[in-house]
Amino acid sequence: MTTAAQLRAESARLLTEKQGSSQGLVPTMGALHEGHARLARTAVEQNDVVVASIFVNPLQFGEAVDLDRYPRTLEADMELLDAEGVDLVFAPAVEEVYPGGEPLVRVTAGRLAGKWEGASRPGHFDGALTVVAKLLHYGIPGTGLPGGGAFVTGAGAGLPAYRAYFGQKDAQQLTLVRRMVTDLNFPVEIVAVPTVRSADGLALSSRNRFLSGEEREAALVLSRALRLLEERANAHEPLDLESAQALVESQPLVGLDYFDVVDPETLEPLAENCKETPFRGEGLAIIAAKVGPVRLIDNLPLSS
């Protein structure tokens, strides 16, 4: 499907046909891999009707060259989603999502957008939240039914439950989407799905295809550094972020952007408080680096 009207009509038809009580949305930019398959699989397990979207959002790319370079693999993506049991695929053109060109009004990510990924990619999260907001609106279940469109779902509302699925790998985006949904009263439950990794520990990413063999081997240092912090947290020891960072910086093909331990909800740094004393509570180790020409991000939840 390529239009919001088609999406609403077809999802309403399927909900009626299945006598469904829940609908899931899996927003993607395509170039799908096993991480996306896990998102789709989880959504199918938890909902009666599942919609996946494939849309390369121009608003979240800083440079046109990055947008042009992003891989488009629609046919393969459709096959993957079909194999996972997704009911509907929404693959709109840019003109469908932004019919008047770039929108005058956007969702702004606020102060959380200026740190970590946002510091390196100005405007990225404003663009990402704007398109997520639109996709969440398109996917509200029941709006294609006669009399549909009420901005309420769930038990007692007369409309199906509504869930949207995001990967833990994009931790800052996940945090911001959750805040947007809470602060702006979106009628949707955000479900986080754990990061999927290859057997050697590399977090799956659509960008991995651009790594040479040597660069891919070098990129493994990111997950190894995160695991060092996890081991220390599990052992109730000080985190020793400096040693983990030195491991990353010892790899000549890797240019470190940031590496820290933050509060999972506020994204404020925690590592400074854990240099001398054992780590306690919940945290999120986050890292970003350029490996050759490819920018990679990863993270790992910490608990002690």
UniProtKB/Swiss-Prot annotation:
Sequence positions that bind ATP: 29-36, 167-170, 196, 204-207
Keywords attached to this entry: ATP-binding, Cytoplasm, Ligase, Nucleotide-binding, Pantothenate biosynthesis
Keyword Nucleotide-binding included in the entry's annotation: yes
Protein's GO biological process: pantothenate biosynthetic process
EC number: 6.3.2.1
Subunit (UniProt): Homodimer.
Annotated binding of (R)-pantoate, by residue: 60, 173
Active site: 36
Protein's UniProt name: Pantothenate synthetase
Further remark: The reaction proceeds by a bi uni uni bi ping pong mechanism.
HAMAP family in the cross-refs: PanC
Pathway listed: Cofactor biosynthesis; (R)-pantothenate biosynthesis; (R)-pantothenate from (R)-pantoate and beta-alanine: step 1/1
Role, per record: Catalyzes the condensation of pantoate with beta-alanine in an ATP-dependent reaction via a pantoyl-adenylate intermediate.
GO molecular function: ATP binding; pantoate-beta-alanine ligase activity
Major place of residence: cytoplasm
Residues the entry annotates as binding beta-alanine: 60
Gene Ontology CC terms: cytosol
This protein's record includes keyword Zinc: no
Source organism of this protein record: Arthrobacter sp. (strain FB24)
InterPro entries cross-referenced by the UniProt entry: Pantoate_ligase, Pantoate_ligase_C, Rossmann-like_a/b/a_fold
Subcellular location: Cytoplasm
Family designation: Belongs to the pantothenate synthetase family.
